[in-house]
Amino acid sequence: MKKLLLTASIICLASAGLAEENPTPVISNSDTEIKLEGFYLFESGYIKQDHLILFDKNVTDNRKKLGFYTEAAFAATISKTINDVIAGAKIVLQPTTRVKTSASYNGSHIFIETSYGKVELGSPVDASAKLRVTGSQVTAGTGGWYRYALLDGQYMRYNGLKPDFDTSASFYLESYSNSFDQINEKTEKARRLNFFTPKMKGFQAGISYTPDTANTGGNKDINNLTLESSGRNGVSVSRTGIKTVSLGNGETMTINQNIRDAFSAGLTYEHEISEDADLKLSVTGEYGKPARRLVHAKMEGTKVIEVLNTYKLSNLKAYNLGAVFTYGNFSCGASYGSLGKSLTAKEYYKVGRDTYYYNGAVAYGQGPIKTSLEYLKTSRYKNTVDAVSLATEYKIMPGLLPYAEISHFQAKGKPVYYPEAPSKTTRGTVGLIGTKLKF
């Protein structure tokens, strides 16, 4: 019943918005404005992948090869303007399906905007994520092949340990530390302070400060791995940003990928070369200190009985360079990003410590139809992913966008703790058909 009411509400709001060229419903008076915006995605995915064993072949609990996926977002922005100062709040509601967490739906926060710039208080999306440019920004479809692929299945493991892979061009602060999958409460990611300058002659800059990436919207602290004698038992309940891997013989490595005193910044430049040609350039980066050390421990069940050693993790240092060029109906985009040796230690990351990615895409749009081709290459600790995606979409009306997409991928690598392990490869093809609704 709740899902039916939510669907009816979205359809009613969307119908009002889609009738206009600007599909965002707005309620306003002389100095107060309320803007409603939302997104819903329905997608069906089919996959064919080699070297999958037993239940690794299942896309869902009881079905191989075929699965459905949904994603949603709904937000209300309330703002008031007094003497050229805009103050307000954006409140993002938790939907009944998987929440969309892109920078375009910049979660719940307070904002104050003047002619000198915009301040965001409590935003879960940092400046580098909002200002970063990648090749995928010009593509059709969703690029969501990774939702159906299994790159670390049983065949790819060694001594029970999984290899690490990257499937997108992203940074630590938005993907590695805190995601909704790692948070028990229905909250957003870490709280931040953001500042963005106004656009001046095509330039815009932004900077963010995050005191602790474990400080999410629903908790104020987090307990790391400790001994029984300290009065705290084991690891934190929420385990936000923490993963523990088993090395056998009762030994584990606990890696806390949370960051303290994290800064992210970005600079973009937009230039209209001619009536038909536009260029956008971006440089973004992140810096921060690891919250804790890597812990090598002896465990009995879920209890730590002895800490064998601790190792220092390297600082977070990451950057991304990106560009998008548009000429008439053609668009192309490219980006390169490096995370270096961020949050690694040689005692565990024995195969390799560097992470980088690059991607490029070309797109052509004619009327309501858009078609694109994208290539992505990632390397995480010398484990590589190559993916090529061909996608097309058709705009039925403003805000309603059916699409189809086919992707071929290859992942090659081994667990980072075992340099003696053989490097293994898995390949596959994913077909997607879906519909996006924005209002």
Curated annotation (Swiss-Prot):
Residues 1-19 form the signal peptide. The keyword Signal applies. The keyword Acyltransferase does not apply. Pfam families: Porin_4. GO terms for molecular function: porin activity. GO terms for cellular component: membrane. InterPro entries: Gram_neg_porin_domain, Porin_dom_sf. Keywords: Signal. This is Uncharacterized protein RF_0053.
